[in-house]
Amino acid sequence: MAEAVLIDLSGLQLNAQKNCHETLLETLDGIHYHHAPKAKFLCIICCRNASKEKDGEYGLCELEAGNGFSRLAGKFETVSHPCLAASLYTIKQKIDEENLSCIKVIVPEHRKLLMKAYVGQLFTEVYEFEFEDLQGAWRDSLLKPSTGINVTTTQELEDIQHEIETYLRSLPALKGDLTIVTSPLIPDNFLHGFTTRTGGISSVPTLSSLNLFSSSKRRDPKVVVQENVRRLANAAGFNAEKFYRIKTDHASEVWVMGKKEPESYDGIVTNQRGVTITALGADCIPIVFADPVKKACGVAHSGWKGTLLGVAMATVNAMIAEYGCDVEDIIVVLGPSVGSCCFTLPKESAVSFHSLHPSCVRHFDSPRPYVDIRKATRILLERGGILPQNIQDQKEDLDLCTSCHPEKFFSHVRDGLNFGTQIGFISLRE
């Protein structure tokens, strides 16, 4: 049974000669009667700029302004915007507020492909959609559908994409200004930083607002994340078209940019100018690497598994092997991550950190000891030859625990499966 029911009336014209207003209202009453016992959200989509048409036909706004719709005010929410992208995104926000995922869309047959194209852009696989033909409810052709819309060409799909992107660009930033944390260790010929959660448009509470990763298991669609990346690129000064994320596997594979890209990897290295590489983080450590001598850089995603597998030194070693870097020239900066105050592991997993160094584990005798993945990363880097003074793991916001600071950072430990993602990024300036 649907948790939310959306009724698309924006593509219809009303035939005033046949008293179709009452027929439509009766049909809406019937839809409400059928779905109200289970659905938590019932909504009618209208077109704000509809107007009186020729030959006695009226747009839906004419009905909305009349007395007929007033009797439905307590039964349906009405969403009316000049463009369908705005209407559907507004509805998505309302659905997300209620944490709903099963959605029925009652839509005229000639608009079904159109609606599916918008839904495909604005929603993820978290949501389950069912489409029902609205025309089956009409009697005696009292309502006349407008000219058919077929979303079949590349140009039409591009137009939808453009409409959605244009609308998202118009939205205000949430939770304050976009903030980027940087390290004084990284020289100016590199562009780098670590993001916080402010300054984006993501509205789901655990993803708000500068979420920078989309997946089938979360509620932020790719187009919203792309808008967040665009805003970050404008603020930081990099080219969003040359933006590469790690394809996380919680392991130690490193992609050398310019060579064949692996299916998954937790490190990237490059010496290409103007290319921005990024490591994801939401408790795991986003790490950036820079060699100002050989003009090369890298990033790594280091969770507890990747830490033990040596992903940080694997990234360093790739820079040495590919670009002739000297280990003593490489600068390493650890971005915000979960602290030992909040991160625990089963004892059988914590044993490996204790073996690395006892100071990496607190309450070792408990069933779930507290583990310091940042300290473990520093130890492994120093053992690999990175100079202690070339490692930055403590500075203002860089060493804040992501789980302890919900106003600044996303956290899987704190927020569960629908968590947001911040990043560490670096590029060699052009």
UniProtKB/Swiss-Prot annotation:
<dbReference type="InterPro" id="IPR011324">
    <property type="entry name" value="Cytotoxic_necrot_fac-like_cat"/>
</dbReference>
<dbReference type="GO" id="GO:0005634">
    <property type="term" value="C:nucleus"/>
</dbReference>
<feature type="binding site">
    <location>
        <position position="301"/>
    </location>
    <ligand>
        <name>Zn(2+)</name>
    </ligand>
</feature>
<dbReference type="InterPro" id="IPR003730">
    <property type="entry name" value="Cu_polyphenol_OxRdtase"/>
</dbReference>
<comment type="subunit">
    <text>Interacts with FASN. Interacts with SDHA. Interacts with ATF6, EIF2AK3 and ERN1.</text>
</comment>
<keyword id="KW-0479">Metal-binding</keyword>
<feature type="binding site">
    <location>
        <position position="284"/>
    </location>
    <ligand>
        <name>Zn(2+)</name>
    </ligand>
</feature>
<dbReference type="GO" id="GO:0047975">
    <property type="term" value="F:guanosine phosphorylase activity"/>
</dbReference>
<protein>
    <recommendedName>
        <fullName>Purine nucleoside phosphorylase LACC1</fullName>
        <ecNumber>2.4.2.1</ecNumber>
        <ecNumber>3.5.4.4</ecNumber>
        <ecNumber>2.4.2.28</ecNumber>
    </recommendedName>
</protein>
<dbReference type="GO" id="GO:0070431">
    <property type="term" value="P:nucleotide-binding oligomerization domain containing 2 signaling pathway"/>
</dbReference>
<keyword id="KW-0378">Hydrolase</keyword>
<dbReference type="GO" id="GO:0006954">
    <property type="term" value="P:inflammatory response"/>
</dbReference>
<comment type="similarity">
    <text>Belongs to the purine nucleoside phosphorylase YfiH/LACC1 family.</text>
</comment>
<dbReference type="GO" id="GO:0005777">
    <property type="term" value="C:peroxisome"/>
</dbReference>
<dbReference type="Pfam" id="PF02578">
    <property type="entry name" value="Cu-oxidase_4"/>
</dbReference>
<keyword id="KW-0862">Zinc</keyword>
<keyword id="KW-0963">Cytoplasm</keyword>
<keyword id="KW-0007">Acetylation</keyword>
<dbReference type="GO" id="GO:0050727">
    <property type="term" value="P:regulation of inflammatory response"/>
</dbReference>
<dbReference type="GO" id="GO:0030641">
    <property type="term" value="P:regulation of cellular pH"/>
</dbReference>
<dbReference type="GO" id="GO:0046872">
    <property type="term" value="F:metal ion binding"/>
</dbReference>
<dbReference type="GO" id="GO:0017061">
    <property type="term" value="F:S-methyl-5-thioadenosine phosphorylase activity"/>
</dbReference>
<keyword id="KW-0391">Immunity</keyword>
<keyword id="KW-0597">Phosphoprotein</keyword>
<dbReference type="InterPro" id="IPR038371">
    <property type="entry name" value="Cu_polyphenol_OxRdtase_sf"/>
</dbReference>
<dbReference type="GO" id="GO:0002221">
    <property type="term" value="P:pattern recognition receptor signaling pathway"/>
</dbReference>
<dbReference type="GO" id="GO:0004731">
    <property type="term" value="F:purine-nucleoside phosphorylase activity"/>
</dbReference>
<keyword id="KW-0808">Transferase</keyword>
<dbReference type="GO" id="GO:0004000">
    <property type="term" value="F:adenosine deaminase activity"/>
</dbReference>
<dbReference type="GO" id="GO:0002720">
    <property type="term" value="P:positive regulation of cytokine production involved in immune response"/>
</dbReference>
<feature type="binding site">
    <location>
        <position position="250"/>
    </location>
    <ligand>
        <name>Zn(2+)</name>
    </ligand>
</feature>
<feature type="modified residue" description="N6-acetyllysine">
    <location>
        <position position="247"/>
    </location>
</feature>
<dbReference type="GO" id="GO:1900542">
    <property type="term" value="P:regulation of purine nucleotide metabolic process"/>
</dbReference>
<keyword id="KW-0539">Nucleus</keyword>
<dbReference type="GO" id="GO:0005783">
    <property type="term" value="C:endoplasmic reticulum"/>
</dbReference>
<keyword id="KW-0576">Peroxisome</keyword>
<keyword id="KW-0256">Endoplasmic reticulum</keyword>
<keyword id="KW-0395">Inflammatory response</keyword>
<comment type="function">
    <text>Purine nucleoside enzyme that catalyzes the phosphorolysis of adenosine, guanosine and inosine nucleosides, yielding D-ribose 1-phosphate and the respective free bases, adenine, guanine and hypoxanthine. Also catalyzes the phosphorolysis of S-methyl-5'-thioadenosine into adenine and S-methyl-5-thio-alpha-D-ribose 1-phosphate. Also has adenosine deaminase activity. Acts as a regulator of innate immunity in macrophages by modulating the purine nucleotide metabolism, thereby regulating the metabolic function and bioenergetic state of macrophages.</text>
</comment>
<keyword id="KW-0399">Innate immunity</keyword>
<dbReference type="GO" id="GO:0045087">
    <property type="term" value="P:innate immune response"/>
</dbReference>
<dbReference type="GO" id="GO:0005737">
    <property type="term" value="C:cytoplasm"/>
</dbReference>
